Amino acid sequence: MGGNEPENEVAVTIAPYRALSLDGGGMRGIYTAAFLSRLSGHFANGRGKGALDLGKGFDLIAGTSTGAIVASALANGNSMDEVVSLYRKHGAKIFPHRIAGKRSALARVSKGGKYVREGDTALRSALADVLGEVSLADVYHKRGISLAIPTVLMSEHRALVFKKTPKSGSRDDKYPLVDICMASSAAPIYRSLAAVTDPNCPDGPKQIFADGGLWANNPILVALIDALANAAPDQPIELFSLGTCPRPEGEHISEDEVHRSMLDWSLGADVGPLSISAQEFAFDNMARLLAGALSDCGRSIRRIRFPNKPVPASMMPFLALDDTRPEAMDRLIAQANTDADLTKSACDDPHNAEGQMIRRLFEGLEPAPEIPLSSLLASN
């Protein structure tokens, strides 16, 4: 050996940059929260400790629409059980009238404004109870968590991402999480557009936003791009992506059925689920291909979409975006528990690479805070 070479060279392991991507899906957000609660609970019980701080396990959390609500709660330090309770307690007020076919769509023609106005008030109140007045800058500076929340700025009809990361500047620092969630979840037809005060010009006109799911219902590419922008050049990236138990999509259409009217599209209500389904497939595969290409160039990027098994056929009647029936929520929670249990089984298999990646994430989590950031700031 050469005289200048160290005798005991120790390999240095660089901690990965971890990002979480959370899909939109209306009331199916209760599935997302229940899944994370169940899986986190398994690891907490295994360590003989109380609840774990899942939000702190990630450098970046991206969430769209209902995923923005879950993302904000994680960043704020709320338990996922609190989010499940939000959907259970307030879901029927947020979506006071379900669109289930042509007849219910027609019923919305005269009373639709009333329904979405009531839902807007209910959602803002529910979010304020959970998130308080916490801003993007608060969770970044006090919790060390970056957020990226897609929406649509209606004044320019362009995509916009509310974000606070080490390289994002200060544009969005003062926006409260409540306003950001309202902006990202303002689904046309199902809910009101979101009128939000611009904190950089509080005396000016309000900004109007529409649901981020119009362009990024699966925000995995948003998460990947921000991870690439903020991770160190030699830092491995681990990207975790979670859906909302989306229903199997597709329909057989005969040639004589292609001339659909507005009523055949339930006055537009059926377009949203079609867009969501197409986006989720496209964005997930684009992220997979991009991550693979970058990995081939020497950048370490690992990506997990969990759970990734087919949705049981028995779940089909309970997967509408605005289904607030107690039995629908019960079924979503039950399915989340089943899927989380299967994911934990994968984590217990030493030969399952994806399971081991998830296991390392959860085993490194800190205990959950005694109170969320919103309560801490309110008491000061």
Give the label of every model feature segment:
Residues M1-N380:
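Patatin-like phospholipase
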